[in-house]
Amino acid sequence: MPQQRKGGRRRRKVDLIAANHIDYVDYKDVDLLKHFISERGKILPRRVTGTSAKNQRKVANAIKRARIMGLLPFVAED
């Protein structure tokens, strides 16, 4: 007899960018960008954050710009 998995379907995560009707992800909006980076400073993948592919590209570019401008760290401080 095959094993049955516990639990049901997981609820789909809401795209934070689309839900708030944000057209342009500003690299200066550090509070918004912190939702999309880990505690180690890495960009979180789509499956974790729930963003669409288009918005994930916007977020990734904004995070990279903010890192270059010195607004976000490249690596986390231990």
Curated annotation (Swiss-Prot):
Pfam families linked: Ribosomal_S18 (PF01084)
GO molecular function: small ribosomal subunit rRNA binding; structural constituent of ribosome
Keyword Transferase listed: no
Source species, domain of life: Bacteria
GO cellular component: cytosolic small ribosomal subunit
InterPro entries in the cross-refs: Ribosomal_bS18, Ribosomal_bS18_CS, Ribosomal_bS18_sf
Keyword annotations: Ribonucleoprotein, Ribosomal protein, RNA-binding, rRNA-binding
GO biological process: translation
Similarity comment: Belongs to the bacterial ribosomal protein bS18 family.
Role played: Binds as a heterodimer with protein bS6 to the central domain of the 16S rRNA, where it helps stabilize the platform of the 30S subunit.
Subunit architecture: Part of the 30S ribosomal subunit. Forms a tight heterodimer with protein bS6.
Annotated protein name in UniProt: Small ribosomal subunit protein bS18
Species assigned in the record: Lactobacillus delbrueckii subsp. bulgaricus (strain ATCC BAA-365 / Lb-18)
Origin organism lineage: Bacteria, Bacillati, Bacillota, Bacilli, Lactobacillales
Gene that encodes the chain: rpsR
